[in-house]
Amino acid sequence: MRALWIVAVLLVGVEGSLLQFNKMIKFETRKNAVPFYAFYGCYCGWGGQGRPKDATDRCCFVHDCCYGKLAKCNTKWDIYRYSLKSGYITCGKGTWCKEQICECDRVAAECLRRSLSTYKNEYMFYPDSRCREPSETC
């Protein structure tokens, strides 16, 4: 499943919140989502299970929970309005779904920035098979 996320982000001309989320991550962390976050820990990338491995992985867990509350929204592909100015991400006006998706992405990107000091290369391409602990609830 995670492979689908990376393919989606790499496709030329891809639009939607996955690409927008990638831009937010780059803005906040100065790192590309691929390869730094696409397969990180148990929750960064598509899907997730087990327990978050560290603060970075917890940002992705919380992001998954945020998207989980938006089950009726098209979280992966809905294009929303936002701006990157003066060091801040600001979500713009749109439908309720688009505004909420943007907020989920903004909060996660800011969380990843705050967690940069705890980023561990050992979790960069972490195999799903090592995420066997019982999952936390949102």
Curated annotation (Swiss-Prot):
Signal peptide boundaries: 1-16
Keyword Coiled coil: no
Residues annotated as site: Responsible for the reduced anticoagulant activity (compared with CBc): E133
Disulfide-bonded cysteines: C42-C131, C44-C60, C59-C111, C65-C138, C66-C104, C73-C97, C91-C102
Cofactors, names only: Ca(2+)
Record PROSITE patterns: PA2_ASP, PA2_HIS
Catalytic activity: a 1,2-diacyl-sn-glycero-3-phosphocholine + H2O = a 1-acyl-sn-glycero-3-phosphocholine + a fatty acid + H(+)
Annotated site (Putative interfacial binding surface (IBS)): L18, L19, K23, K26, A33, V34, A38, F39, K76, Y119
Cofactor note: Binds 1 Ca(2+) ion.
Keywords: Blood coagulation cascade inhibiting toxin, Calcium, Disulfide bond, Hemostasis impairing toxin, Hydrolase, Ion channel impairing toxin, Lipid degradation, Lipid metabolism, Metal-binding, Neurotoxin, Pharmaceutical, Presynaptic neurotoxin, Secreted, Signal, Toxin
Residues that, per the record, bind Ca(2+): Y43, G45, G47, D64
Family matches, as CDD domains: PLA2c
EC number: 3.1.1.4
Name the record gives this protein: Phospholipase A2 crotoxin basic chain CBa2
Organism, scientific name: Crotalus durissus terrificus (South American rattlesnake)
